Amino acid sequence: MQTTIIYITGVYDTLDLFTQELKNAFETLGYASFTYDARLEEESKQALIECIEEGTKKGQRFFGVTFNNLGYNLALPEARTETGDACSKQNMGYSPKDINSSREPNLWETYEIPYINILMDHPFHYEKPLQNAPDTSVVLCTDRNHVHYIRRYFKNIRYTDFLPHAGVELGSRHKPLAERGIDVLYAGALPIYTVAKMIPDLSSIPEVDGEEMAQVVLSELVHHPDRTTEDVIEEYLKYKRNDISEQRIHEIIVQMRFIDSYATSFFREQAVRILVENGIRVTAYGTGWDQCEWSDNPYLVYGGKVLAPEILPLMNDSKIVLNTMTWFKAGAHDRIFNGMLAGAAVVTDDSTYLRREFTDGKELVMFSRNEIRTLPDRVFDLFGHMQSTQRMADCGYQSAKEHHTWKSRAAWIREAWM
């Protein structure tokens, strides 16, 4: 029986890169592909419906595999839901209540297609899509804490699980570290310069003083950086108001999620700044690095903003790839695995997941956010012992190649959810 996987592209270059890697991986496992291009919405939807209806007649199976809720609300055209249509909603398991509802018929629900939704960010960024997720959803989170968050606050989602980030390799022959031109590469924006649109009217939270809450929560995260943003917000709310409901806690967490980006930005900037101020040359790409008060430091090389695929060749020419988490405490980031697959020495802040998967100094270097002041010494040590650094990079490459590619993730999805 042929199985076709439906992908959605044409919205974000980073997600297109991940999607192409997953598509390649599933095709090597024997799955057929259909790619819905969001830039050609009507043509893509028509072609998708025809593909599903023709395939269903032949007994084929379909799955949607996508990122960050792309296509969650794909709806059928009205003409296809009228009585006598090949896809009668009553025949597809809809109740009279569903049929009389004003809600547009969801494509995934109508055709009973599992919608496998991989979240690359914290679920609190996706309140509306997750509350309105198709009934056929399987939500895969890249941090174990996010799985708990989904189970607690999104009771409508029946299936959720943990799927770590994965890496992409460009080419198969990688230069030795000694021959590479970039000393330390940081590829990622400073969120503090792009987060303004997320900040709510802090006076609109009647239960507490919003400005005070923002300051207290951010301070707690900075001083105790192993805590999650949602836990600290909840702790503050319950300290101030012991009668606050579960639903209201969730609503305020969503409103105050910008604090997560502030904390991420604080440590990201701190990691790069402490290196350049200690005479280590860092090449940084992404929004915001040219707006810091210390941006004129001669050891900071700012490369501007580039698309996701353009980062991979830069990693291939980097001795060290530096990563800081997007406040993930029980997950990873694709920068880590991309850097390993580029044959670079990866230096990253730790997480419970990374500590289980790797050994500090064997496949990569891990540092605690509480000990960020030791970071320059760790990096100087790598440059001072290039033979052992090369061995670590080689070990990291082998580990990522065997366990942390999108091919590995596709194999897991197949076993667990297909």
Residues covered by each model-derived region:
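Short, hydrophobic beta-strand segments that form beta-sheet elements in well-ordered domains
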Residues: 35-36, 116-119, 138-142, 162-163, ...
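Conserved beta-strand elements of the Class I
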Residues: 4-7, 185, 345
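Short, surface-exposed amphipathic charged segments that create phosphate/polyanion-binding patches used
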Residues: 130-134, 174-184, 380-383
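Catalytic binding pocket for nucleotide-activated donors in carbohydrate/polymer assembly enzymes
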Residues: 9-10, 17-24, 29, 34-41, ...
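Nucleotide-sugar donor-binding catalytic core of glycosyltransferases
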Residues: 9-12, 18, 153-329, 351-354
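Extended catalytic core of nucleotide-activated donor transferases of GT-like folds
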Residues: 5-9, 16-153, 168-173, 303-310, ...
